[in-house]
C-alpha cells in the first residue's frame, strides 16, 4: 500500500489548472497526493464565453469538473484566502500544507464574462441576468476596446443588428488608442484597423484616443477624459480595461509586478519564493502573452519542472517555456459567428493577415467550443 506523504496543491480550475493537475497525477499519482482547489463543481471555457451574452447554450462554455479531471485527484471545493511558501489557507480557514504549490488562479473578469469565482455553481443565474440586462438596455457602453470587449461587441452586433441600424439600440466603446485592441505589440496594425473599421462601419460608436472617467454621484455618466465637460450617458456600462490577475492574499515581498501579476521565470517558478516550491501559470503571471496558443508547451514544461524540483530541490535544472517574449501573437478576433479577423507570424516572412472567411470558419462559428473538453482533459 502506497502512503501519500507529500502534497502537490494546484489552485484554480481553468484550462491550465485542470491540465496541470491531470498531468501531474498521471506522472506522480502513485507517490504524491494531487489536490485541486476550486470554487466550483464546473469548469468555464473563456474563449467561448462571449457568446453566453446572447445564447443559453451553456454546454459550449461550461462542463462538469468531473468530466475533465482524472478521478484520483482530490477536489477541494473552496477558495484560496491566503498562502505562503508552506501552506495555503482556504476561505473555510482550513490550512493545507504543500511540497509544491501551483497557482493557476487566472484573472478576475468583469461582467458580463465573470468567472467561477464570481458565480460558483450558479452560472445559469449569472448569465441569464447579464443577458437580460443587455436585452433591456438602450445604450450599452464598453470602457476599453481590448480583445474581449471587441468580441463582445461583435456578438451584440450580430444579435441586435437591426435594432442598432434603426437607432433603437446603441453600443459604444471608449478606447485609449487610435485603433481597437491593445497597443501592446501583440497585434499588428492591420488586424487592429480591420477590427476597428468593421465595428465602426456596422454601427458601433467609437471614442478613440479617449479615457473614460466617472463620478460616484453619476454612475451612468462617463466623461470623455479626466476633467472633461464632455460626457455620454448609458444605461449599461461594462468596465473591461485590461485583465485583473487573481492573486490570493500573501505577505511575500516582491511577489507581483506593478500591475499585480505574479513575477515568474520562464520555467514558471515564482521569482520571489526562495524555496523554489511555488509555481504559477496562465493569466495570473507576468508573461507578456496570456492565452491558449502555447497551452501544450506550457503544461508539459511546468509538469517536467515540478517533477525536477521534487527530485532535486532548488538545484534542479529547469527548462524554459516558449512564452512569446517578442513579436506578434497568433490571433483570431471573432466578431460574431460570421465575422472575424486574424494574424499569424511566420519566421522570416513576418506576420501575415488571415482572411475573414478563414477566421469565421476556424474560430467565429464555434469559438473553439469543440476543443473545450480536450484542452482541459488531454
UniProtKB/Swiss-Prot annotation:
Belongs to the FAD-dependent oxidoreductase family. One of its GO terms (cellular component) is mitochondrial outer membrane. The chain crosses the membrane at residues 7-25. This is Apoptosis-inducing factor 1. Its cofactor is FAD. Its main location: mitochondrion. It is a single-pass membrane protein. Keywords: Apoptosis, FAD, Flavoprotein, Membrane, Mitochondrion, Mitochondrion outer membrane, Nucleus, Oxidoreductase, Transmembrane, Transmembrane helix. Gene3D superfamilies: 3.50.50.100. It comes from the Eukaryota. FAD binds at residues 12-16, 51, 56, 283. GO terms for biological process: apoptotic process; positive regulation of apoptotic process; response to singlet oxygen.
Amino acid at each position: 500500500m502506497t502512503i501519500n506523504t507529500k502534497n502537490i496543491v494546484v489552485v484554480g480550475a481553468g484550462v491550465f489548472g485542470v491540465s496541470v493537475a491531470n498531468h501531474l497525477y498521471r506522472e506522480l499519482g502513485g507517490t504524491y497526493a494531487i489536490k485541486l482547489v476550486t470554487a466550483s463543481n464546473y469548469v468555464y471555457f473563456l474563449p467561448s464565453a462571449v457568446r453566453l451574452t446572447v445564447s443559453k447554450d451553456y454546454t459550449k462554455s461550461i462542463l462538469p469538473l468531473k468530466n475533465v479531471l482524472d478521478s484520483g485527484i482530490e477536489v477541494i471545493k473552496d477558495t484560496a484566502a491566503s498562502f505562503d511558501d508552506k501552506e495555503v489557507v482556504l476561505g473555510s480557514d482550513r490550512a493545507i500544507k504543500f511540497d509544491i504549490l501551483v497557482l493557476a488562479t487566472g484573472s478576475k473578469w468583469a461582467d458580463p464574462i465573470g468567472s467561477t469565482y464570481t458565480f460558483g455553481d450558479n452560472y445559469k443565474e449569472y448569465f441569464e441576468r447579464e443577458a437580460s440586462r443587455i436585452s433591456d438596455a438602450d445604450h450599452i457602453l464598453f470602457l476599453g476596446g481590448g480583445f474581449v470587449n471587441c468580441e463582445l461587441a461583435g456578438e451584440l452586433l450580430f444579435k441586435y443588428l437591426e435594432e442598432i441600424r434603426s437607432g433603437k439600440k446603441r453600443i459604444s466603446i471608449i478606447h485609449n488608442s487610435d485603433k481597437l485592441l491593445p497597443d501592446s505589440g501583440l497585434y499588428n496594425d492591420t488586424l487592429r484597423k480591420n477590427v476597428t473599421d468593421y465595428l465602426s462601419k456596422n454601427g458601433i460608436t467609437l471614442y478613440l484616443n479617449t479615457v473614460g472617467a466617472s463620478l460616484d454621484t453619476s454612475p451612468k455618466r462617463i466623461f470623455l477624459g479626466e476633467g472633461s465637460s464632455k460626457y455620454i450617458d448609458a444605461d449599461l456600462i461594462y468596465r473591461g480595461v485590461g485583465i485583473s490577475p487573481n492573486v490570493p492574499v500573501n505577505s511575500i515581498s516582491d511577489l507581483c509586478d506593478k500591475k499585480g501579476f505574479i513575477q515568474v521565470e520562464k520555467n514558471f517558478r515564482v521569482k520571489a519564493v526562495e524555496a523554489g516550491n511555488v509555481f504559477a501559470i496562465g493569466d495570473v503571471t507576468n508573461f507578456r502573452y496570456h492565452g491558449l496558443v502555447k497551452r501544450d508547451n506550457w503544461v508539459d514544461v511546468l509538469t517536467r519542472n515540478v517533477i525536477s524540483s521534487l527530485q532535486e530541490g532548488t538545484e534542479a535544472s529547469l527548462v524554459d517555456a516558449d512564452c512569446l517574449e517578442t513579436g506578434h501573437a497568433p490571433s483570431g478576433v471573432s466578431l460574431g459567428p460570421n465575422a472575424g479577423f486574424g494574424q499569424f507570424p511566420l519566421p522570416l516572412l513576418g506576420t501575415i493577415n488571415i482572411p475573414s472567411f478563414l477566421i469565421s470558419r476556424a474560430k467565429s462559428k464555434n469559438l473553439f467550443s469543440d476543443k473545450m473538453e480536450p484542452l482541459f482533459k488531454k
